[in-house]
């Protein structure tokens, strides 16, 4: 099946905290993937958390936000590195592809767990024909933030440059002239030193951490006390139980404000990340279709 826009709209039925509903096929597959990721992390005592809209869904809906079609997890950089060294090898390579940041076919500064033999192809034309485009879970690193205010702002700015360079390399398409110009201006800048500045791997005692590589627009929505990522609690999510921040109220308030309040009915729409969604066939079978697609509306996501 292709043309995810109309399919996602049909599948995104409303649910409240008290009401039960049937998951869309896409959400059901994401939940299955999350369970496998969770089992691998628990086996190796790797600390991760549901993050962003997925954490909001856990708290407010005890599962997916009904009109959402993605799944996000986050780890402190040290745990993130351990995930790839210890947990990722536990995942069945016949079913999963681990798309790690810095890989030969993935220029972004976060990673994805992809499901083989599926397609979740977004609204752009990849420059790299070998990029895996299966259904995915986003895996975000959380990095050390300097204790010096001026250096923090420098880290934020450096992350914007790194992201712009990565988006250009990936083939990101936008109708924003400002974004196009910024990506072009960033192209000659060195990526390695900027990445190291953003990560500050040696600064493991910093009081604050950041998610600048998740590409949030506002500085204050991407910086958190380290304890928010170190301290977790299990919370029901659909028919499973998964870790969220023990400080979820403060975290979600920072991200969303009054997160308990549901959006107006007209705003409860699927994000429609995918231009082509196929849960039964590989993205490889849709490459020619993707090549010939034109996009009237570009995704605002970096994913």
Task: Kindly give the residue locations of the regions a language model identified.
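Short, Lys/Arg-enriched N-terminal segments with co-localized hydrophobic residues
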Residues: 1-13
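Short hydrophobic/aromatic beta-strand micro-patches
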Residues: 74-76
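Active-site nucleotide-donor binding segment shared across nucleotidyl transfer reactions
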Residues: 38-71, 80-81, 227, 255
